[in-house]
């Protein structure tokens, strides 16, 4: 059986660029068919009203909507449209989504909230395309090496397994905090685990500082250093996350969870061992 998955990508968070890739890392998984539609960097209601109906015209077993701030007007419109649709759907968002998770549940939708997927320092004096790309590369490292992406992988794979078993997919209600992420990372060395925990906690705080610099402080002489400091914090978090993985590599204890020939999740730690 081939499970048909729809992904609606509006705006960008650190999970957005790799979401579909987490499900099919070698582009050879036989049991899923993934289609992605989106609205680029923007997520205003007008863009949402074009992207979501486009996906709903397709025959999908379930749909995932991913964006920043699920409570913002655009994502709120997406939730409204998806809650009225005859297809199981879930929302993936960043920490502001915690404020509307009860609403998401009431709308009959699932959710994954990634607390350490932070807002970027979107001040024109500071953020250019190079800085934007650098920030997102740091987010990806943090979320990959702290285990957050593995939680996303496992959660969606469980939905796929439900559909394969002939059941309606169980819609998740997952908040990825430090404990949830690092547990999924499977670190064996306590120092590696501590570094991963530190990385996740720092990344979680980055959003608070960027919110201050982008919305609360109006003096450029003050808000420019504020958003720059948030990006420096994230770079430090990425460095810690890399150091955590390097410790595990030195001990040959890196946990890897590739997908098998039938789409099942395998596991291994020894580099030269076959996944089982």
From Swiss-Prot:
Any one GO biological process: methanogenesis, from carbon dioxide
Biochemical pathway: One-carbon metabolism; methanogenesis from CO(2); 5,10-methylene-5,6,7,8-tetrahydromethanopterin from 5,10-methenyl-5,6,7,8-tetrahydromethanopterin (coenzyme F420 route): step 1/1
Xref: InterPro entries: MTD, MTD_sf
Gene Ontology molecular functions: ferredoxin hydrogenase activity; methylenetetrahydromethanopterin dehydrogenase activity
E.C. no: 1.5.98.1
Catalytic activity: 5,10-methylenetetrahydromethanopterin + oxidized coenzyme F420-(gamma-L-Glu)(n) + 2 H(+) = 5,10-methenyl-5,6,7,8-tetrahydromethanopterin + reduced coenzyme F420-(gamma-L-Glu)(n)
Keywords: Methanogenesis, One-carbon metabolism, Oxidoreductase
Biased composition (Basic and acidic residues): 259-276
Pfam families noted in UniProt: MTD
Source domain of life: Archaea
SUPFAM superfamilies attached to this UniProt entry: F420-dependent methylenetetrahydromethanopterin dehydrogenase (MTD) (SSF102324)
Sequence segments annotated as region (Disordered): 257-276
Similarity-based family: Belongs to the MTD family.
NCBIfam families listed in its UniProt record: PRK00994.1
Job description of the protein: Catalyzes the reversible reduction of methenyl-H(4)MPT(+) to methylene-H(4)MPT.
UniProt-listed HAMAP family: MTD
Record protein name field: F420-dependent methylenetetrahydromethanopterin dehydrogenase
Encoding gene per record: mtd
